[in-house]
From Swiss-Prot:
Gene3D superfamilies linked: Methylpurine-DNA glycosylase (MPG)
Assigned keywords, A-Z: DNA damage, DNA repair, Hydrolase
InterPro entries attached to this UniProt entry: Formyl_transferase-like_C_sf, MPG, MPG_sf
EC number: 3.2.2.-
GO BP annotations, alphabetical order: base-excision repair
SUPFAM superfamilies recorded: FMT C-terminal domain-like (SSF50486)
Protein's recorded name: Putative 3-methyladenine DNA glycosylase
Organism of derivation: Clostridium acetobutylicum (strain ATCC 824 / DSM 792 / JCM 1419 / IAM 19013 / LMG 5710 / NBRC 13948 / NRRL B-527 / VKM B-1787 / 2291 / W)
Length: 205
């Protein structure tokens, strides 16, 4: 069952934590890939120095964040890679959740071909570990690109659905790659499923 709009229209931290264990799905050209969300980061917009919309910054790139909750915000980094966020809160409040890592469920052969141009059984241990354990890696594996920016997650192409009813421990950690964000770099707004092998960066004790 797909997540309804009201799921996303809540406090961003709550949405981030509750996205763990849910299933990200992308259906394109008759090919379905999916994966359990195992790591996320929350970004709280105007007052968050780590966020793209800090200080009320509003550009064509960040416009999706100002739109209705339950839409995709997909952006390009380093001139090479895409990252996918889920827009949260209410329209006009530019907050979102970065999907950092997934555990593949469906279409793993397709993911392998997209990431490494190899059959899944031919992947090295390193490639297996790095199939979807990062925001740009999962976008490459699931073919999430600029075309999916602003996409309604209540549609039939890119969406998130309920996962299995399972219990797990959530780890709270610092977000990755925002050392410029002054005090915001220390916020424990990265959340991941403890013990999952697909998490990108483990918390240092």
């Amino acid at each position: 069952m797909k997540l309804i709009r009201e799921f996303y229209s809540r406090d961003t931290i709550v949405v981030a934590k509750e996205l763990l264990g849910k299933v990200l799905v992308h259906e394109v050209n008759g090919i379905r890939t999916s994966g359990k969300i195992v790591e996320v980061e929350a970004y709280r917009g105007i007052n968050d120095k780590g966020a793209h919309a800090y200080g009320g910054r509003r550009t064509p790139r960040t416009e999706a964040l100002y739109g209705p909750a339950g839409h995709a915000y997909v952006y390009f980094i380093y001139g090479l890679y895409y990252c996918m966020n889920v827009v949260a809160m209410q329209e006009g409040i530019p907050e979102g959740v970065l999907i950092r890592a997934i555990e593949p469920i469906e279409g793993i052969e397709v993911m392998s071909e997209r990431r490494f141009k190899k059959l899944f059984n031919d992947l090295t241990k390193y490639q297996l570990k790095n199939l979807t354990n990062g925001p740009s890696k999962l976008c490459s594996a699931m073919e999430i690109r600029r075309e999916q920016n602003l996409m309604d997650l209540n549609g039939d192409e890119l969406y998130i659905e309920e996962g299995k009813n399972e219990s797990f421990e959530i780890v709270e950690a610092k977000r990755v790659g925002i050392d410029y964000a002054e005090e915001a770099k220390d916020y424990l707004w990265r959340f991941y499923i403890k013990g999952n092998k697909c998490v990108s960066v483990l918390k240092k004790d």
